[in-house]
Amino acid sequence: MQTIAIKDFIDIKYIKQDQISEIIISRPQVLNAFRPRTINEIIAAFYDSREDSSIGVVILSGHGSRAFCVGGDQKIRSKTGYIDEKGRSSLNVLELQRIIRTFPKPVIAKVSGYAVGGGQILNMMCDLTIASENAVLGQSGPKVGSFDAGYGSAYMARIIGQKKARELWFTCYQYDAFEAYKMGLVNWVVKIEDLDSYAIKLATDILNKSPLAIRFLKSSLNADCDGQSGLQELAGYSTMLFYMSAEGQEGHRAFLENREPDFSKFNS
């Protein structure tokens, strides 16, 4: 079947083929970092896939082999969030996290290269993850004056354990694909040249199963962490307040100035 471009998006590519849709974050010039428009386009693509009864599985990926996504574009971050094209502050990635989490069809992350910061959290929100051998995963928030105290930390702790989640967040270390596999952040590690074909095979295997059974199973598996949705909303507000603080701004400025942040004056 011919691959069909559904929308004329700017920041993403969206294709449908053989009951599978793929949403590709396409900002390779910034390692697929997202801005508010990027997130709005991804959300629109998810809505389209949800309403299209011919689609049974969604794949989320990044353009090229250098990066899946490195989180929010720090160059457009303000004191209260990320600036959209109308000059408004936004943290709409939190809405995207909820959409992926509750999406009635399986969502597969196809990770090549860097998946760090908010990009790693998007990977984590997907139901399953296939990573290529060159994948690098980790968190970066505390280095740049940011954090995710919702799904990004609470759900992470549920997946990889409290100690390991604290390690990721407190140190901002980065981990290769095999280390991420051992932690439980990815399900499979494959050669980079096999990544696309493996993702299609996995999606096809899922399509051969009962869609209603899988939908119910996803809801049941999510139920264990349902309380985290309220925590995520509260955490979103606290993140915006933190961006306004001197400490949050120091991390952001240090990133833009390509220097190490000096958080020593904020120790108490």
Curated annotation (Swiss-Prot):
Its cofactor is hydrogencarbonate. Substrate binds at V30, L31, V70, G71, G72, D73, Q74, Y114, A115, V116, G117, G118, S140, S146. Pathway: Quinol/quinone metabolism; 1,4-dihydroxy-2-naphthoate biosynthesis; 1,4-dihydroxy-2-naphthoate from chorismate: step 6/7; Quinol/quinone metabolism; menaquinone biosynthesis. It comes from the Eukaryota. It is found in: Plastid, Chloroplast. Belongs to the enoyl-CoA hydratase/isomerase family. MenB subfamily. NCBIfam families: menB, PRK07396.1. This is 1,4-dihydroxy-2-naphthoyl-CoA synthase. It comes from Cyanidium caldarium.
